[in-house]
Amino acid sequence: MSIPTDIANLLIGEDAKLSIHFDKIPLHNDAHHSGSKFYMLSTNRALRDHEEKEDDLKYLSKGRQGAIRLNQLLNAPHLIKERESTAQNEGKAVMRLGETAMVIDETFDAQPIHSHIWNSFMSIEFRFPQADFTSLQYLQTSWKGLESGDTLYTKEGTPTFEEVSIVSGVCLFNARLLEMSTTCPKSGGVDVDLLKSSTPTYNELDYIARASSAIADVAAMNILRACEQDSGQRLTIKLDIPSWHYFHTVATKFVSKQCSNTEVLQWMDAVDQRHDQIGQTFVEAIRYGLEQRGIHDSTSYGIGMTSRTNTAAILIRTAIEHEEVPSLDAILAALDSEEDGCWKRFYEMIPVKERPSNLDQLGYLYYVYEAIRPSLAERPAPVPLESDQTKKANLSKKALKKRKPRRLIISVDDSAERRIYSRAQRVLSKIRQCSEKPETYLVESYVCRRFLVNGNEDRARLGRLDPLPDIPVRTGFHHEPMLPLDVVRQLYGNKSALNLQRWLQEAGLSV
């Protein structure tokens, strides 16, 4: 295990020249950070100075508390701090707080960057002794509803939650490629070849490399806890890979008669193909990460990605095939009548003023839906014995509430997606108030960025300013292009880059 010391910095000059520089992450422990938009803190030293620098450390302490609660959740009840070393000697996986915090400016206000909880990412060590593997993550954790003492299993070894799911996702292409492909300068229509010929972007590969290891850490801890308790509980990992969410762009072009329905359908095919290729690569990266951590039994977990042929996608395609305009009302009605009833239950929780008025807004709301979908699925409840029914009749409402099934969703994502999960938390709060629905809780975990734009001066996101199809050079080496895999190699290691290259080629993507 090595502490990351580099951040990739995409420099976009006034003359539109592009270069990538690898910056060493500065270590600061004073109150003045010279305007730096990213740096590292030694948390032990900083927390000792808490009284002298209370404003500086108020949110650092809150961030640390979030990490402590994640520690309590994932570690077994008996693995309290004093016995972590004993647990490791026994071969049990253990999560420990590290000694540093990464501070990356994520906010859009004038406050100093060290005075906002959104900016602090705590170092966390995941140790898997049986696999002789240790991983270091910089995570930021948000909670709502769960009690501080909640763990995956009780001291008696009973699962606290009837279901545990991990959710994540990755954006396809980048904003520039998607925009260029729908504004072809030659025809004014769409440029399908631009999408088809696009190599994997900086944003796609950086995120998969960054998030897959964090997902594997959290997932492996869950799986190993289930094995220790012999609970038979199977972890579910769901990756939300967009597809039809992007279709509104070309649908608008078709409505304005700037392209034919054939071109639109070909553009949709290119997006769907990318959905499959990037999704397959992401799945393989997580599987490999689990194997590194000693998880070789694939029956202990299920991993999959969202479908690109759901109701909304089919209706949009069908309308375009018949040279018609996709109808939002028709799509909503079809979603509402789906057999499993999940969307119907979800949509009932959305205030009328927050409901979508176009396909773009529907696509965004669908991200929220997928994030909490595990809470919406209905499971057949076991029929209680007659004696149990008698006991249940005598229980108080408070006691009944405690006996409700509980489900846990852990998100592992980029902090750029925070709005999705914040909105998901609001819906889950409503669901928990319904007596007939399981109590579902969402633990938000955000992985720290390692690829910044212009020193993070404007907090710009790589997904929006990813330079492809243009290729930057390495700063100071004007004839050395820095391809996406080159950046992965520099930030995450040669093995990570080689594995990604192999999985991408197996998925049919040229790199």
Swiss-Prot record:
Pathway annotation from the record: Secondary metabolite biosynthesis
Keywords: Ligase
Taxonomy, superkingdom: Eukaryota
UniProt domain comment: The conserved DDXXE motif is essential for catalytic activity.
Protein family per UniProt: Belongs to the arginine-containing cyclodipeptide synthase family.
Record function comment: Arginine-containing cyclodipeptide synthase; part of the cluster that mediates the biosynthesis of a highly modified cyclo-arginine-leucine dipeptide (cRW). Within the pathway, eshA acts as the scaffold-generating enzyme and is responsible for formation of the cyclo-Arg-Leu diketopiperazine (cRL) from L-arginyl-tRNA(Arg) + L-Leucyl-tRNA(Leu). Additional enzymes from the cluster then further modify the cyclo-Arg-Leu diketopiperazine (cRW) scaffold.
Protein name: Arginine-containing cyclodipeptide synthase eshA
Species in which this protein is naturally found: Penicillium shearii (Eupenicillium shearii)
Lineage: Eukaryota, Fungi, Dikarya, Ascomycota, Pezizomycotina
